[in-house]
Structures are given as structure tokens and as C-alpha cells.
């Protein structure tokens, strides 16, 4: 079990670090309105929604961002770390190599969390 906890922690950290790097590069934003504006101007983006955000807010964003790749395996507190705040529910990344890497790592984390 100790190994499983460590693996999950490392996968989570990898995802958070990729989002933080994208933010520093100007390729990521957080917050409902910022994400909506971002997606309106950049339809080839990646959307990340905290899996513990309010259901109505998550569903509204999913409808707005229909067709945009979506990640939902991170908690609001985990996303918040990437932006230096307590929580972040909605995050968008530009169509960049970091988004591709994040999709890969998030898929690994999702599979691991489903198994664990």
C-alpha cells in the first residue's frame, strides 16, 4: 500500500508541475470566466475541471467546451497548487506540448486512481 500511495503522489505531482509550467509560460489560466474567454479564443485547448467542483458548474463548462479534450482526475486543491492559490476548479491549457504531456500523465493518474 505504501508504494501505491507514493506512485499516486508522484503522478499527481507530475500533473501539477506540468500545469504550473504551462502557467509560467503563459499557456494556462484558471477560473470560470478566464477559462471561458480562453476557450472562446483558443478552441484547440485542453480543459481541466476539478472532480470535486460543484456539479452544476462542471456541467455548464462541459457544455460550453463541447469537443474540447477534458481531464477530470484532479482535485480542486491539487489544481490550486499550480496557480498558487487554495483551489482552482476550472483550468485551460493552450495547444502546446505541455498539454499533450498533461493528457498522457493524467490518463495514467486516472487509471491508477480507478484501480486504487
Model-based region annotation:
Residues 112-116:
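Internal, active-site/partner-interface "lid" segment
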Amino acid at each position: 500500500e505504501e508504494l501505491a500511495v507514493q506512485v499516486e503522489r508522484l503522478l499527481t505531482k507530475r500533473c501539477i508541475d506540468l500545469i504550473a509550467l504551462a502557467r509560467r509560460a503563459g499557456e494556462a489560466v484558471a477560473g470560470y470566466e478566464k477559462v471561458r474567454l480562453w476557450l472562446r479564443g483558443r478552441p484547440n485547448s485542453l480543459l481541466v475541471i476539478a472532480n470535486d467542483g460543484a456539479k452544476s458548474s462542471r456541467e455548464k463548462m462541459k457544455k460550453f467546451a463541447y469537443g474540447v479534450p477534458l481531464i477530470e482526475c484532479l482535485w480542486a486543491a491539487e489544481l490550486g497548487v499550480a496557480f498558487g492559490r487554495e483551489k482552482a476548479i476550472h483550468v485551460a491549457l493552450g495547444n502546446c506540448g505541455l498539454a499533450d504531456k498533461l493528457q498522457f500523465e493524467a490518463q495514467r493518474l486516472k487509471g491508477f486512481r480507478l484501480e486504487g
